[in-house]
Design a protein with these regions (language model features):
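Short, conserved beta-strand element in jelly-roll/cupin
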Residues: 166-170, 179, 183-193, 198
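A short glycine-rich, His/Asp/Glu-containing loop-to-beta-strand
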Residues: 59, 159-167, 205
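Transition-metal
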Residues: 6, 12-15, 25-147, 164
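Short, surface-exposed loop/turn motifs at beta-strand boundaries within globular domains
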Residues: 52-56, 121, 158-160, 169, ...
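Long, hydrophobic, well-ordered secondary-structure blocks that form the structural core
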Residues: 138-153, 157-162, 173, 187-188
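Short loop/turn motifs at secondary-structure junctions and domain boundaries
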Residues: 175-177
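Double-stranded beta-helix
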Residues: 189-229
Length: 229
């Protein structure tokens, strides 16, 4: 079950995260004592070839984020209970990978436990955006992740990053798309199959569509055909 994933993005000049986001946006310190802050030191294992090719091609690496207490059911429920709901999106998906169906699900007044139960039992995914700004523990974890990458990858030194937590049902569809900003997807719990298609190959995506995505004038979703398989 692909229950939780941390999607961390590195940005260029178009995107900047303030060094000290507004204090009222953070919720962690109100309820989480210092002793409960994450002790886990992220461990990322990249081969020598992957370090040399980082940022030039898709890479697969191992990590230990699944050992963090931040991704247990109890921690996810607590996060959802205290998370600013205007930054949380619940979306129900369809069954046809060629037909994009993301229906917004209302979650006002729905507890974190109820949301997590709906994810486990349905065809739903939660897009917990800006999780690093809403909870300092996740910000600290992402900072440690990038500190590891910076130490391992020559020339890698991002000036800004942000994190999104994805909590998805085992049967939820992730539709064919292309991410604009450079992204790292850290799969944490459950099992997930991922299809990656050749970059800049116009059999799978037209260059004009990619240009529109990077220019911010169209959504990241792309037309999908079963012939791609």
């Amino acid at each position: 079950m692909a229950l939780s994933e941390l999607k961390a993005s590195v940005f260029g000049q178009r995107w900047r995260r303030t060094a000290n986001p507004p204090a009222e946006f953070f919720v962690t310190d109100r309820t989480i004592p210092e002793r409960a802050r994450p002790e886990l030191t992220p461990v990322i294992q990249l081969s020598g070839a992957d370090k040399a090719d980082f940022g030039r091609r898709p890479l697969v690496a191992t990590h230990n984020l699944h050992q963090s207490e931040l991704f247990t059911d109890a921690a996810l429920i607590d996060l959802l209970d205290h998370f600013p709901r205007q930054h949380l999106y619940a979306l129900a998906t369809g069954t046809d990978p060629a037909r994009i169906e993301n229906r917004l699900a209302l979650h006002d007044g729905v507890s974190g436990a109820e949301l997590l139960r709906a994810v486990k039992n349905g065809r739903l995914w939660l897009n917990v955006t800006q999780v690093d700004r809403a909870d300092r523990r996740y910000r600290e974890l992402i900072d440690r992740l990038y500190a590891q990458l910076t130490a391992q990858v020559p020339g890698f030194s991002p000036f800004a990053s942000r994190g999104t937590l994805l909590i998805s049902s085992p049967r939820a569809n992730v539709y064919y798309h292309a991410d604009g900003p450079a992204s790292a997807l850290w799969h944490i719990r459950g099992r997930k199959r991922i299809w990656i298609y050749p970059a800049l190959d116009e059999r799978y995506v037209q260059r004009e569509l990619l240009e529109d995505i990077f220019a911010g004038v169209r959504h990241e979703y792309l037309p999908y055909e079963s012939a791609y398989e």
